[in-house]
A protein has these predicted regions:
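Extended amphipathic ligand-handling, pore-lining, and cofactor/metal-binding catalytic surfaces
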Residues: 1-277
Length: 277
């Protein structure tokens, strides 16, 4: 955003580790911020991720007794730069491994964060977002064959999205498996431990060569697409968020897309790239 001539303060808050939203809210208020843009770094909108992040911010604002305009930006996985970014990671990983995605003995597997089925029954479209995002990324990587598995927290007594990633790996008839952590935009225990160690062990026990695609959290293209998402709501050169309500229809820089009202959030002023469907 700074490279685009916009004077914007950027803060990073986490849901489960420091700095938590309460700390960032206090800091932003002390800095004299007049309005906020809330952008969860979850490409695929879900109730326990994106929607929960908005709720955490709203709760922090309420505890701070700070009545500040907030523009919420929800699911953004259709952004073409994001699709290209994930596809390029797949192609590069396959190239480094010396395998071809066109080879029938090479399997492309998307590993998505699982969600309780009850959320889908209540109207969440998370599984649909996963399916369409994987289809778009696979097409951009010019790979016609792929499968999707979910990383589920089976220690909780709930019905989860299926198939789980372990079952997918157990069913693959191939020599190589290229695994894409499609729901994740940073490396953490669910990629570094669950995939790189636990799933790798299961794959190698079945004779599969395991190749994991890195999460492109530090790629400049990722920072650029986040700037694309925020720029329509920043008033240059003041750097303040503009009109936090009634913004549906605004075009997004460097794309053919425009914002629509978020159907998952269902709150005035929340926009996303999924609402038109």
């Amino acid at each position: 955003l700074a490279e685009r001539g916009l004077d914007v303060r950027v803060y990073c808050a986490f849901q489960f580790t420091d700095p938590l939203p309460d700390e960032i809210v206090e800091q932003a208020r002390d800095d004299g911020v007049a309005s906020l843009i809330a952008l969860p770094v979850y490409p695929l909108c879900g109730p326990s991720t994106t929607i929960a992040a908005f709720a955490a911010l709203r709760d922090a604002l309420e505890r701070a007794e700070w009545d500040v305009p907030v523009q919420e930006i929800s699911g953004w996985h259709p952004h073409p730069a994001y699709v290209r970014l994930r596809a390029s990671g797949i192609v590069e990983t396959a190239s480094r491994a010396g395998v071809s995605l066109a080879d029938p003995r090479v399997a492309l597997v998307f590993s998505a964060h699982g969600t309780p089925v009850k959320y889908l029954q209540e109207g969440s479209r998370y599984d649909r977002y996963v399916q369409e995002n994987c289809a778009a990324v696979a097409a951009a990587a010019e790979c016609e064959r792929y499968v999707i598995g979910y990383q589920n927290h089976t220690n909780r007594p709930l019905e989860w999205t299926q198939p789980d990633i372990e079952s997918v790996i157990a069913s693959i008839d191939a020599d190589h498996v290229v695994v894409v952590p499609i729901s994740f935009m940073h490396e953490q225990s669910e990629t570094l431990a669950e995939l790189d160690h636990e799933l790798r062990e299961e794959a190698e026990a079945r004779g599969l060569a395991f190749h994991r695609v890195p999460v492109p959290y530090d790629d400049p293209a990722f920072a650029s697409l986040l700037a694309d998402l925020c720029e329509p709501f920043v008033d240059a050169p003041s750097g303040t968020a503009t009109r936090p309500h009634g913004v549906a229809g605004r075009p997004i820089p460097n794309t053919q897309l425009a914002y629509r009202a978020c159907l998952c959030r269902g709150q005035p002023g929340t926009v996303c790239l999924n609402g038109q469907r």
